[in-house]
From Swiss-Prot:
Belongs to the universal ribosomal protein uS5 family. Gene3D superfamilies: 3.30.160.20, 3.30.230.10. One of its GO terms (molecular function) is structural constituent of ribosome. One of its GO terms (biological process) is translation. The lineage of its organism: Bacteria, Bacillati, Bacillota, Bacilli, Lactobacillales. This is Small ribosomal subunit protein uS5. Keywords: Ribonucleoprotein, Ribosomal protein, RNA-binding, rRNA-binding. It holds the Pfam family Ribosomal_S5_C. GO terms for cellular component: small ribosomal subunit. It comes from the Bacteria.
Amino acid sequence: MASFIDPNQLDLEDQVVSINRVTKVVKGGRRLRFAAIAIVGDKNGHVGFATGKAQEVPEAIRKAVDAAKKSLIEVPIVGTTIPHEVIGHFGAGEVLLKPAEEGSGVAAGGAIRSVMELAGIADITSKSLGRNTPINMIRATMDGLTQLRTREQVAELRGVSASSLED
């Protein structure tokens, strides 16, 4: 399990990915609520996401941002991209994340693009496979990002020196 990342030490930006109106039918009619999905990141290798639900949109957004700050993860970045190719899974959604050459930009759509930009990854290629609802794409992307390892981390896990690893 990763250690806790203190959001107060970071200069975080937030972005609302989606706001969904949810109704519950009760005896007296319909009850309206709102669900918001927010992503926070410092554009320097830290990113988190969460959902917030409330009777008013601003309150749902505030709850989502506050919860996202508590779920930050650290993303290993090599130059301007990720260290290696990875596939993240969540539910019926899959996301393929591939490193890209410097200057190629973020080739990702929708919610995946927001995660990458707030994580500070400038060059990456991605492909969404399976279902593409925003929350499942974000969760699959975060799953993929948590699987990333740097060359030094892999060498330490294998018990060898980083220079002995092949490219």
